[in-house]
């Protein structure tokens, strides 16, 4: 069933915006992940001397307790917005996408938008322990190192492919 509404008629600006939205949102998420890596790796060696780990660890915990609640809502909102855009791209004017891989790619993108959930519980355990007032600073830094390993794997296995699929789906969707 196609949602052939006048506002999304073939060639309309609304349809073009819909087709481009996965590219925009996956790029935002990828840049967020890169910024996250550079921000968090600053607290770890070689950028931080092991001699300063207790001082830096305490500052890191305070920073994390402040930044996570501020950033979390925005990231979740963008992920949800991306999913809605991908679902709409699957069902709005699907006949326009015949002869291209766009619909398939929007579906792959939707799958990848959920793929990070496989590591989310482990990452949330790290985050809770890092932010806990009972966690001593040097342990928080050890937890951060472990979290970074899991996050780096997620970045290369999920986030980069998610972005590539977003780019590819957009290109396919616009040329269809």
From Swiss-Prot:
Pathway: Secondary metabolite biosynthesis
Main location (coarse class): membrane
Membrane-spanning ranges: 5-25, 71-91, 104-124, 155-175
Induction summary: Expression is positively regulated by the oxaleimides biosynthesis cluster-specific transcription factor poxB.
Subcellular location field: Membrane
Cysteines engaged in disulfide bonds, as pairs: none
GO CC terms in record: membrane
Record carries keyword Chaperone: no
Membrane topology: Multi-pass membrane protein
Keywords, alphabetical: Membrane, Transmembrane, Transmembrane helix
Protein purpose: Part of the gene cluster that mediates the biosynthesis of oxaleimides, cytotoxic compounds containing an unusual disubstituted succinimide moiety. The first step of the pathway is provided by the HR-PKS poxF that serves in a new mode of collaborative biosynthesis with the PKS-NRPS poxE, by providing the olefin containing amino acid substrate via the synthesis of an ACP-bound dec-4-enoate.
Name of the protein in question: Oxaleimides biosynthesis cluster protein N
Species this protein is from: Penicillium oxalicum (strain 114-2 / CGMCC 5302) (Penicillium decumbens)
Gene: poxN
């Amino acid at each position: 069933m196609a949602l052939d509404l006048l506002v999304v008629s073939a060639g309309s600006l609304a349809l073009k915006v819909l087709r481009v939205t996965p590219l925009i949102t996956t790029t935002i998420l990828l840049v967020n992940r890169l910024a996250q890596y550079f921000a968090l790796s600053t607290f770890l060696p070689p950028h931080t001397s092991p001699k300063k780990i207790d001082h830096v660890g305490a500052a890191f915990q305070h920073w994390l307790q402040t930044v996570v609640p501020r950033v979390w809502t925005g990231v979740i909102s963008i992920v949800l917005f991306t999913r809605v855009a991908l679902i709409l791209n699957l069902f709005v004017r699907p006949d326009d996408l015949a002869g291209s891989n766009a619909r398939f790619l929007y579906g792959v993108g939707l799958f990848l938008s959920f793929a990070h959930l496989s590591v989310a519980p482990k990452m949330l355990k790290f985050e809770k322990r890092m932010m806990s007032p009972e966690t001593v600073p040097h342990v928080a830094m050890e937890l951060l190192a472990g979290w970074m390993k899991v996050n780096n794997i997620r970045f290369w296995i999920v986030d980069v492919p998610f972005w590539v699929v977003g780019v590819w789906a957009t290109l396919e969707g616009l040329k269809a």
